[in-house]
Amino acid sequence: MKKKKILVRSVLVLVALAALCACAWCVWYIVQYYQGQAFGDRMRTNISDDGGSFQLGRVKIPVDFDELQTMNPDIYAWIKIPDTDISYAVLQRGAEDDQEYYSKHSENGAYYSGGSIFSQSYNRKDFSDPMTVLYGHNLRNGRMFAQLNGFSDAEVFESHRYIYVYLPDRMLVYEIFAAYPHSNEHLLLCHDFSDAEDFAAYFDDVLARKSLQSNVREDAWPQPSDHILTLSTCYRGDNHQRYLVQGKLVAEAYAK
């Protein structure tokens, strides 16, 4: 009987310790998550919608990349679409790492089902590729890339013409030329955008497949020499489709 009591007590102690550890982990996770959110929100308040008058050729970079990269060295850029809530750090893992890591982790690296805005190692971090793709979830709370689906509305599309990307040493300005639903194929693995014919064929197909959910600016249509930025998110909860918003590089301003 005495041995049985000792065994029961031991089990209860182990259960209590496990519960305590679980609670401690939950508290740590919540603190890490909200610290990351607060940090990102603070950064967002410093970034204006006017792009820092990029036409002048020199801009003050409104993002403190030193502080961001101290928090997480995977942060390498910041994306903003004026007059929307899209204003986030951009992250990328190394070539040997899980390329979907930031689909389930926040900007500070804490686990978060809403993820972050991220690219994959198929792209260079200087946005010099013919096609750069950034991914983000379509969250019900409107965060990340949820507002991209709104570009299916013609008025929204016409009133939002530019995407800003900030790097530590410069700012890139992209003119939005298309927004449309697309299959969930991996663009960078299924197409060679460095090949002029493949590039032209892809975008010819985009024009040919215009639908009620698509909007395009044919006067701003890209050429094979252009650098394209694609923003990709889930299309209205359909895991088999993505909604893409695409822009071409039209201006580049270096830091003051």
What feature does the model see in each segment?
Residues 22-256:
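Solvent-exposed, non-transmembrane regions of membrane-associated and secreted proteins
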